């Protein structure tokens, strides 16, 4: 059976709403980023799907109902097709999905992404924000390969990001 985990997709898309709070955190981390370092990092808090088809992501974005606490976000995820992602952090669901036309790719919780760009845009004459991401599978693979201690605690800035996004217990110092 062909493996569902892959590395041959170049660009993936997602249309969804996000909270103003999360959007403002992304802007903050992007503005504080140090060039050359993966500093504006966000993690998936739960399972997360993207699609290989931009039009499908736009359709989902158009279906989103928002209120004063949310904005519409159109994510463009760059996958480096030259990397062997052997951590199995994502799967191509198209061949096993009940809805294969959606061309879904599933990312597992704690998949890491670097925020590359945030900008205002319009889809179907409706305001939204484009959020360009880079998948950090290579970064995670290197962390995993270099890990010497199972209980490694990230540096303070990285730890603060994890805390702020609710991905690290507040009791960890």
Report each predicted region and the residues it spans.
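Mono-ADP-ribosyltransferase
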Residues: 1-173
